[in-house]
Amino acid sequence: MTIYLVRHGKDDDTFRGGWSNHGLLPIGIKQVYALAKEIAITNIHVDCIYSSDIQRAAEMAEILSNCLGCPIEYVPKLREVDNGILAGMENNLADERYPGLYWSTLDYDECYTNGESPEMFYNRIKAAWLGLKNRRLKQTTKDALLVTHGGVIEAILCVENNVLFSNKTRHFSAPNAKLIPIEIS
């Protein structure tokens, strides 16, 4: 069985992401339709789409669900990092109000104000991912799709490849609207 990880389509990067609720840009929507076409052409069959409930991922999941004819299950625990007060803030305003505050500048156990730390994020994603994998293995042998975020995919790939997760270094690439297959057994 395969679970295909996919990062949401292009969103507006002039805002801080995290738990923001900005949707996809028009180019991001085009990326989603192109991915749906690619899935159909390559004869990939999924019986379920799991998705973060944050707007940019949920919007992608809804389009894919309509194109592929399969249900969506929203998984809030597979959201991007909770960046607290920075969520959805314009980058220039965030830089002005909170100079030098970035994901990569946090200590591993340091939380965003009203948010979570890299350690909390990784532990949340690891637990949610392992739970989803175990549930799939018990219920079905069919493939599935997980629509989520770059940071979530990074954490999952660290789990799957036994790589030490860090907010200081990115180990894997997760381009917008590209499938990343994970074989589950």
Predicted regions, residues:
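Glycine-rich phosphate-binding loop signature in dinucleotide/nucleotide-binding domains
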Residues: 42-45, 132-142
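Domain-level recognition of soluble alpha/beta enzyme cores
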Residues: 161-185
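General small-molecule cofactor/ligand-binding pocket signal
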Residues: 4, 73-75, 183
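Phosphate-handling substructures
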Residues: 66-126
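Short active-site segment of divalent metal-dependent hydrolases/proteases
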Residues: 11, 152-153
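Generic beta-sheet signal
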Residues: 3, 140-150
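Active-site-proximal alpha-helix that buttresses catalytic centers in soluble enzyme cores
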Residues: 3-71, 116
